[in-house]
């Protein structure tokens, strides 16, 4: 089952919809980022009961520390490997390069696989495009963990 807008966590009928997914015993593809800010222990438990190969979350605003705290709090609730728990990192939109890089490092440190998305890529500075190339190419990202050393 491919969910094109899977923000079930914000839906008033989230519990019934999640139960339908669980009962279906089908593989569930949450194609967009689930809103971690709305996560509770009950919601995490129901997501864990779904057959899924990957989870996506997002951390768009570097000033939003609640998002990071929730990501940190619930990482252990999802038993998927690090490379199967992705977090979209919006860049080139109300953030500095330093803030973008800090989010990438912090997410990696707590067990998520960051995925850099560049807003209006054609206007982005070269270092932002390089950050995206470094972070999203997982062979490079794992081989060279320090962006400053990436050539």
What label would you give each PLM region?
Residues 77-83:
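Short, basic (Lys/Arg/His-rich) helix/loop patches that form interaction surfaces
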Residues 1-71, 84-93, 113-117:
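Core AdoMet radical
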Residues 22, 79, 105-109:
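Anion (oxyanion) recognition and catalysis
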Residues 90-151:
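Auxiliary Fe-S-binding modules of radical SAM enzymes
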């Amino acid at each position: 089952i491919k969910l094109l807008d899977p923000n079930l966590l914000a839906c008033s009928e989230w519990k019934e919809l999640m139960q339908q997914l669980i009962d279906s015993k089908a593989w569930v593809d949450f194609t967009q980022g689930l809103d971690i800010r709305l996560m509770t222990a009950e919601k995490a438990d129901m997501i864990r009961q779904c057959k899924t190969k990957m989870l996506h979350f997002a951390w768009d605003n570097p000033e939003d520390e609640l998002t990071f705290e929730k990501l940190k709090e619930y990482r252990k609730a999802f038993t998927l490997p690090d490379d199967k728990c992705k977090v979209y990192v919006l860049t080139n939109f109300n953030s500095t390069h330093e803030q973008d890089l800090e989010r990438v490092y912090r997410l990696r440190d707590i067990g998520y696989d960051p995925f850099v998305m560049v807003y209006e890529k054609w206007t982005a500075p070269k270092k932002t495009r390089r950050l995206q190339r470094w972070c999203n190419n997982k062979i490079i990202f794992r081989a060279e963990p320090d962006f400053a050393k990436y050539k």
